[in-house]
Every structure is written in C-alpha cells, then in structure tokens.
C-alpha cells in the first residue's frame, strides 16, 4: 500500500494594517484572538495551547505569554494598529492589556470592556466551599 503524502498548507500572508485584539479572560484560562476590522480571525492563542496546564493557565504570566504569541503571529500579516476588547473576570486580563501596549511596533487605538452583565438573568453558580 502506498503511503500518502502529507501536504501542509502554506500560510497566506495578508497585508492588514489595523485589527482588533479580543481578550477573553475566564477563571480557568485566557484566550486571545486577533481579527481584522471585519471580524475575520488572523491569529489566536491561549494559555492552555501554550503548554500551561491546570491552575497555571489562569495566571497573569500565562495570559501575557498568550498575548505575545498571538501578536507575533499577527505581525507576520502586517498588523500595526490594534484596538483591544476585553471580556471576562479572569486574573490575566490586566496583564494581557498591559502586554499589548508594551509590544514593539504595535499602536493601541482603543480599549473597551465587553463583559456581559446579567440584569437579573440566570441564577449564578453556588459559592465554593473549600
């Protein structure tokens, strides 16, 4: 039986100057997605995807590494200006925003909190007893 050749797709580099960085900081993980202005994903990263496991995924350092990884991937597509949209109550949200601002060659245009707030909607989960 003949072996199949594995064909790897080439990354098509797009020239996109402006984009939006979505930071979703949950209690367990931090996910970062870089999109163009229309909302099409260019690059993404997460703390768990970088090898952080268990409770280490929710640390501020893991969030910083996830942001740097996603923005380095996005820089290959020519991103120079980004807006930041932050969602969630996680511990990595402040560090993630700071590390976007500290990235060389990337200018931050706006910062917006898009955390959904319930107006007496669903009942929240019960309190933890440790």
Swiss-Prot record:
<dbReference type="InterPro" id="IPR019981">
    <property type="entry name" value="Ribosomal_uS11_bac-type"/>
</dbReference>
<dbReference type="InterPro" id="IPR001971">
    <property type="entry name" value="Ribosomal_uS11"/>
</dbReference>
<comment type="subunit">
    <text>Part of the 30S ribosomal subunit. Interacts with proteins S7 and S18. Binds to IF-3.</text>
</comment>
<keyword id="KW-0699">rRNA-binding</keyword>
<protein>
    <recommendedName>
        <fullName>Small ribosomal subunit protein uS11</fullName>
    </recommendedName>
</protein>
<keyword id="KW-0694">RNA-binding</keyword>
<dbReference type="InterPro" id="IPR018102">
    <property type="entry name" value="Ribosomal_uS11_CS"/>
</dbReference>
<dbReference type="GO" id="GO:0005840">
    <property type="term" value="C:ribosome"/>
</dbReference>
<dbReference type="GO" id="GO:1990904">
    <property type="term" value="C:ribonucleoprotein complex"/>
</dbReference>
<comment type="function">
    <text>Located on the platform of the 30S subunit, it bridges several disparate RNA helices of the 16S rRNA. Forms part of the Shine-Dalgarno cleft in the 70S ribosome.</text>
</comment>
<comment type="similarity">
    <text>Belongs to the universal ribosomal protein uS11 family.</text>
</comment>
<dbReference type="InterPro" id="IPR036967">
    <property type="entry name" value="Ribosomal_uS11_sf"/>
</dbReference>
<keyword id="KW-0689">Ribosomal protein</keyword>
<dbReference type="Pfam" id="PF00411">
    <property type="entry name" value="Ribosomal_S11"/>
</dbReference>
<dbReference type="GO" id="GO:0019843">
    <property type="term" value="F:rRNA binding"/>
</dbReference>
<dbReference type="GO" id="GO:0006412">
    <property type="term" value="P:translation"/>
</dbReference>
<dbReference type="GO" id="GO:0003735">
    <property type="term" value="F:structural constituent of ribosome"/>
</dbReference>
<keyword id="KW-0687">Ribonucleoprotein</keyword>
């Amino acid at each position: 039986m003949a072996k199949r050749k594995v064909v790897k797709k080439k990354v098509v580099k797009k020239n996109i100057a402006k984009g939006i960085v979505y930071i979703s900081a949950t209690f367990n993980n931090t996910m970062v997605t870089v999109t163009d202005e229309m909302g099409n994903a260019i690059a993404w990263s997460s703390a768990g995807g970088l090898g952080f496991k268990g409770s280490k995924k929710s640390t501020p350092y893991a969030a910083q590494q996830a942001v740097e990884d996603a923005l380095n991937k996005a820089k290959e597509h020519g991103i120079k200006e980004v807006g930041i949209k932050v969602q969630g109550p996680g511990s990595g949200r402040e560090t993630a925003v700071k590390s976007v601002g500290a990235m060389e060659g990337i200018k931050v245009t706006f910062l917006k909190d898009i955390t959904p707030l319930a107006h007496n909607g669903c009942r929240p989960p019960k309190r933890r007893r440790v």
